[in-house]
């Protein structure tokens, strides 16, 4: 089959100076059709992008299989935990990918609690032949839509996102194109590994900066949840504030670790029952942990009185204790301290470097002695979003 040259642009900046850099990827027509279909699902524009005969899981799985194959063919990829592709492989596990079809259901249901995020301007893309049907149908328009989707996704990953599942779904699509981009005419700093590093570092920074809640959550819509959680958390010990996620997760699995654990779980249980009714999901318990981590946990934490930490840090502590379940209090405190310092380092590099080099990852892991944490994440033999 004939390969097409797709031109797209990504945004880079130093302080307030922004620069759009044009890239060129070589893609087959089937790949372009597949990526357009997946991006139309990502941006909730599937009704105006023609994609007959394609199914979400099949196309997304093709994307993941291709990325994993590319990563596995890289020399020393499996031997070096400092390799950004090895770290990124955490998000490419089969257990995690099986959850992705549910992610779309979750994103669609929770969208009403978030401010809208930018999407490609379809009207500006459509040619005169496609406009009568109000649908992107011709190959040329699909190429334009794909290029616009990549630029919009890139800006969205930099500016922050509404639901934490969004980058989980979007980053593999970007990765797929980066792995098919020609870097021969680019400067040494602009290469595959550095661009992947740039995306990962920006993603991680936004995650620990609490951008989703602070910038995109419609807090007035969530007030009823906080009120319900306030009733349920009465009597919860302060030392358990950073274990709420672990307590609720255990309670979901029928293991009570605190007094009145069933009462503590009730607000979230009611929310999931209502979500099940509205989404027609037969086994809503399959997505319970994902919804709890990504959305409802925050309302429990907002409702707590006499908090020892800011809510954003309390949320981070809950997630760290949940994932690093065998860590002692001392180890958790040390990890949180490291993350605070890492956030400063990342902020500095994002502001002063147009492109963050892969060596930055190695520098951070070595500087803060993160080999143990990275190894634990890479070697997890279960899906931490579905314990």
UniProtKB/Swiss-Prot annotation:
Q: Please give the function described in this protein's UniProt entry.
A: Plays an essential role in the production of budded virions (BVs) as well as in the envelopment of occluded derived virions (ODVs).
State whether keyword GTP-binding applies: no
Instruction: Provide the taxonomic classification.
Output: Viruses, Viruses incertae sedis, Naldaviricetes, Lefavirales, Baculoviridae
List the source organism: Autographa californica nuclear polyhedrosis virus
Q: Where on the tree of life does the source sit, at the highest rank?
A: Viruses
A Pfam family reported for this protein in Swiss-Prot or TrEMBL: Baculo_p48
Write down what this protein is called: p48 protein
Report the principal subcellular site.
host cell
Please provide, in alphabetical order, the Gene Ontology terms of the cellular component aspect for this entry.
host cell cytoplasm; host cell nucleus
Q: Which family does it belong to?
A: Belongs to the baculoviridae p48 family.
Q: Which UniProt keywords are listed?
A: Host cytoplasm, Host nucleus, Late protein
Its localization reads: Host nucleus; Host cytoplasm
TM region positions: none
Hydrolase found in the keyword field: no
């Amino acid at each position: 089959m004939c390969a097409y040259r797709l031109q797209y642009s990504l945004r880079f900046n130093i302080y307030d100076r922004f620069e759009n850099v044009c890239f060129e990827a070589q893609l087959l027509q089937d790949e372009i059709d597949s990526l357009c279909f997946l991006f139309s699902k990502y941006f909730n524009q599937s009704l105006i992008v023609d994609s007959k005969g394609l199914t979400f899981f099949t196309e997304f799985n093709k994307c993941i299989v291709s990325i994993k194959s590319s990563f596995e063919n890289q020399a020393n990829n499996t031997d070096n935990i400092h390799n950004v592709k090895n770290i990124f492989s955490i998000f490419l596990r089969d257990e995690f990918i099986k959850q992705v079809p549910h992610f779309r259901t979750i994103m669609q249901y929770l969208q009403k609690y978030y401010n809208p995020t930018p999407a490609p301007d379809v009207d500006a893309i459509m040619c005169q032949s496609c406009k009568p049907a109000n649908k992107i149908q011709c190959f040329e328009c699909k190429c334009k839509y794909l290029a616009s989707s990549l630029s919009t996704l890139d800006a969205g990953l930099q500016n922050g996102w509404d639901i934490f599942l969004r980058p989980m779904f979007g980053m593999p699509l970007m990765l797929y194109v980066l792995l098919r981009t020609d870097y021969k005419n680019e400067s040494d700093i602009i290469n595959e590994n550095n661009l992947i590093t740039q995306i990962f570092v920006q993603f991680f920074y936004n995650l620990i900066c609490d951008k989703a809640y602070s910038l995109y959550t419609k807090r007035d819509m969530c007030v009823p949840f906080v009120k319900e959680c306030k009733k349920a958390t009465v009597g919860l010990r302060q030392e358990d504030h950073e274990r709420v996620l672990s307590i609720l997760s255990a309670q979901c699995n029928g293991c009570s670790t605190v007094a009145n654990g069933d009462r503590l779980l009730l607000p979230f249980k009611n929310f999931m029952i209502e979500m099940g009714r509205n989404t027609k999901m037969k086994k809503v318990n399959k997505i319970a942990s994902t919804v709890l981590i990504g959305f409802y946990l925050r309302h429990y934490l907002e409702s707590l009185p006499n908090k020892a930490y800011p809510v954003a840090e309390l949320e981070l502590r809950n997630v760290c204790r949940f994932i690093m379940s065998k860590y002692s209090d001392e180890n958790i405190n040390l990890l949180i301290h490291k993350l605070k310092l890492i956030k400063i380092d990342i902020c500095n590099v994002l502001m002063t470097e147009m492109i963050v080099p892969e060596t930055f990852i190695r520098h951070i892991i070595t500087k803060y002695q993160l080999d143990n944490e990275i190894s634990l994440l890479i070697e997890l033999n279960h899906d931490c979003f579905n314990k």
